[in-house]
Amino acid sequence: MRRKTLLLFSLILLCLSTDSDAQPNPSPREIIGVDRRIDWSQAGIPGSIPNRTAFCATLNPGATAAQINSAIAACPSGQVVFLSAGTYNLSAGIDFAGKSNVTLRGAGPDLTTLVFTGNVNCWGQSASICVRNADLHWIGGPAHSTTWTAGYAKGTTQITLGSTAGLSVGSLLILDQDNDTTDTGGVYVCDTNTACATDTSSSSSSPGRNLNGVDRNQQQFVQVAAIKGTRVTISPGLYMPNWRSSQNPGAWWARTKATLDGIENMTLDHTTGGAKGGILFLNAYKCWVKNVKSLKANRNHVWLYQTARTVVRDTYFYGTQNALALSYGVESFMGSDNLIENNIFQRVTAPVLMGNSSGTVVGYNFFTDHYYNVASWMTTSIDAHDAGTGMNLFEGNEGNGFLEDNIHGSHNFATVFRNQFTGLEPGKRLQTNAIILMAHSRYANIVGNVLGTSGYHTVYEHSQASGHTGSPDKSIYLLGWSGVQGKTAGGMPYDPLVASTLLRWGNFDYVTKQAQWNSAEIPAGNAVPADRTLPSSLYLSSKPKWWGTMPWPAIGPDVTGGQDPSGHVYANPAQVCYNVTPKDSHGILIFNADRCYQQSPPAPRRTSGFNDLPLMPDT
């Protein structure tokens, strides 16, 4: 971006407006059928992240991890453990140890720095910071489990369990069912090697329970709202349309959960800590990370493990230690309704990795320089990686690409809305695609995006359905292949259902150089949209206050005057923050979200009628 544009955006950031100029949004019903979507407005913490003002303890540089842990343990509910400005050299990790309703807050990521030279055991995994519940609860040994005998329809909030002993109102319930043993020819949940997964092991090791030798990767995390006998009211309602008695549906839950814990306003340096995870949320609910600068994590910077309605926002992630496989930014390993919003990812190999998550929103993030040890290979900004992912929304992001791989199995009902995916990074020439949906990635919705790079991409779609099977690395779309770069692999054939169930509408691409409003790209069973009007958002009811005066929406075929050659793209706030924030001598941002974004009430949401412990498995 040119200097004048940078200066303009700098001035915009300094004088952000508090008003909203959003126009009323048309219903998403006009484009995406109700069977293919959910109400994403409920992702994250209902209302907003708590703004706590009472301090229970103030610690200064020189404090040890043990002293920080003691302060957290002694902190009354709803208060803050404050780490004043300076550097804390910690030879062990920080452990919330089952404590709920506490905020760990620094003076700002440019003022308070935690340097880890050790870590903490977090129910069998290692982390720099562990936010966990009080009792071990994982797929190999749930505290409580039962059968689920009735109430399977999409959207229902009433289910019947075999037993409710040990269950109480407010419990976090995990619903699951057996994977499909054969291809259904439609919605397909599978992690079996050669049938749907290319992992070289006999099982792909996607997360989830295994009962009687059958994996259970489809899950949804719900809260218990009421109990009457064995009839249970849940919130939210069921997301997927394929819950059914033939798959032996069941439920499991912990005795406790970590609730409303937050980590704010600090830098975390994981470089020499030896932890697998940076911040690990385990059996957590309504927790958050906000305004954190996270440096050089190992497996991941933030690990959302058996976690629901947790928020990661206004945060800067830099680097991974190995730049290989298992080098992630935010990893949503198992969970529902999490919100990953307005973050910056720089030199992170795989910035957002989706395990078997449902109802999660990944919104308005900026991704740059996906550093990988194979210099010419482009890893993608967002990757759906494990079997059982379904009904997740990816909106307003600016990065290089979106991928649903088949390393660990199948995926269903991803919605990709108003993103810019360039399909390219400097120096990359392999896997340079904007959208990759591999075999058994079905029922995706791709709407209102700007895709590809002018002068580089030459093929619209590489698939058997299109009849074009050349130049795979210069294609906007790569659809249905079981192997990389338009090949078959792992003993698995091409999957024609990826293309035939795909919904595309209003996407601008740099091959045809126009937006595609093509009724032939609307699949059977979904009505062709009546017009070309797109909603501004699928989860926000209007422009959020932290957006300021910048154009809203920022991306789409209906956007004009933007910064890219098509005029259809403006920088989102995370990209603007990246562009204008000074860097140190290593190219790392001198980051503080409070200097970039207006602090304000939460974004308005759409309303809808939808409703020696054994180690946990690795992938």
Regions found by a protein language model. Give the residues of each.
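Short glycine/acidic-rich loop motifs that flank beta-strands on beta-rich extracellular proteins
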Residues: 79, 90-93, 109, 113-119, ...
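Right-handed parallel beta-helix
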Residues: 101, 179-208, 212, 217-221, 225-228, 259-270, 285-296, 308-321, ...
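Extracellular "leader-to-stem" segments immediately downstream of a signal peptide or signal-anchor
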Residues: 2-265, 269-272, 474-619
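Short, solvent-exposed linear motifs at loop/edge-of-secondary-structure regions
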Residues: 164-177, 217, 221-223, 257-269, ...
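Predominantly extracellular beta-rich ligand-binding scaffolds that present long acidic/polar faces
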Residues: 103, 122, 402, 406-505, ...
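Repetitive beta-strand solenoid architecture
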Residues: 77, 84, 90, 98-100, ...
